[in-house]
Amino acid sequence: MALQIYNTLTRRKEPFVPLEAGTVKMYVCGVTVYDYCHLGHGRTYVVWDTVRRYLISRGYAVTYVQNFTDVDDKILRRAQQEGTTMEAVAEKYIAAYFEDMDRLNVLRADSYPRATQTMPEIGALIDRLTSIGYAYPAAGDVYYSVRRFAEYGKLSGKRLAELEAGASERLQDEELARKKDPFDFALWKGAKPGEPAWDSPWGAGRPGWHIECSAMVRKSLGETIDIHAGGEDLQFPHHENEIAQSEAVTGKPLARYWMHNAFLNVVNSSGAEEKMSKSLGNFKTLRDLFEVFPPMALRLFLLKTSYRNPIAFSAEAFKGSEQNWRELEEVLQLAGWIAGQGRPATDDIESEPWVRRFNEAMDDDFNTAAALAEVIALGKQLAGRYHAAIHGTPLADPARFAREWRTFALLCDILGLKAAEPEARQSALPEAEIEAQIALRRQAREERNWAEADRIRKQLLDQGIVLIDHKEKPTTWRHADP
């Protein structure tokens, strides 16, 4: 079937028809760079990276743009806490973002526009909104007049009448006094003492968050794009306000397809699920999790649930994904062994039923849960035949095995699942010593001396060796991820 995408704007799945055949213009809202990324951020950018990878695999030329919000109240507060500048804070956490995403094998965007590098375009957009009556200056600020945009609420489904109750209570008195309507939002904020500011026709100040993205989309990709994506928490008010700003100026849709990924929840001490967020203080940074879990196992865990469904994270829930990744990685590392079988594979992998079923799953609104299930099933089949072969049962059809392995590797690549490089996995421990320790552990297990068996396992892990226990075959081992 043709690719179907759930469009938040229309609240239904629709056939994907890009503006220009064969090309996709895609914009993803990036992080506000004031802290390290948590697993919720990991989910967001793994999801959209996988969407991008799949579109590329289907022959589209994808231009993928993701911004950095590098001027914001949170960044200013962090700069004050750390006794440094807003610029230094932004650079620190942008570098940390790239380190984390590289470990999750998230491809680099084609460009990363920053708010501070888009000030002329932001100013021009605000000026245009003011000149056509959609915005007004007020005591050094500039506000967007929400009621002027007749279609406000079309993305989120929210109506102003429903939002009206309590709207004024959410505002500070001095801000409310400057607004013509409690719903209006800031496009430009007048300068405050000690804060960075830029010159403008309305006085020195800095832009509001929503206008930054409207300007960056317009500058990087044009007036209308194919896909605008982000976390579901951005649907309102951020994306709603982007639409109001951009479409008031152009009279054209900002994006043809709006896509939003669901939250990643954590299981709290009472067993209830709650959104992972910095404001709730329940978040786990990616770099902390990397100390405990292999990055690719985290990526696999995030792909096990389709992007529009929430994920409940706990250490217990993660264990199955870690084992899945160990098994998949073992198969991914068979390239050298396959070459040694002496029978090259044919190039015809698109005809493989595995590819067909994988594509059917991904064509159904990027259903990574179903697509990954196909990859895991294929990996288990290949692993079974490989283990039989190394224990004396020759492959019935080496060429077919090689072809299916290439199919497996291709599908893993589309999902962004990548085995660690061999040189990064090396341990100084001699292989003979590893096997000797495994034998001692096997003896301890036979004697039901679980404490000793666990001690040996941990000792090997500390030296970079991961043991993999199997139900019906001897324990195997692999080098740990870097």
Curated annotation (Swiss-Prot):
It is found in: Cytoplasm. Its cofactor is Zn(2+). ATP binds at K278. Zn(2+) binds at C29, C213, H238, E242. Binds 1 zinc ion per subunit. It comes from the Bacteria. CDD domains: CysRS_core. It is an enzyme of class 6 (ligase). SMART domains: DALR_2. One of its GO terms (molecular function) is cysteine-tRNA ligase activity. Keywords: Aminoacyl-tRNA synthetase, ATP-binding, Cytoplasm, Ligase, Metal-binding, Nucleotide-binding, Protein biosynthesis, Zinc. It catalyses: tRNA(Cys) + L-cysteine + ATP = L-cysteinyl-tRNA(Cys) + AMP + diphosphate. A motif ('KMSKS' region) lies at residues 275-279. GO terms for cellular component: cytoplasm; cytosol. GO terms for biological process: cysteinyl-tRNA aminoacylation. A motif ('HIGH' region) lies at residues 31-41. Its EC number is 6.1.1.16. It holds the Pfam family tRNA-synt_1e. Belongs to the class-I aminoacyl-tRNA synthetase family. Monomer. This is Cysteine--tRNA ligase. It comes from Gloeobacter violaceus (strain ATCC 29082 / PCC 7421). The lineage of its organism: Bacteria, Bacillati, Cyanobacteriota, Cyanophyceae, Gloeobacterales.
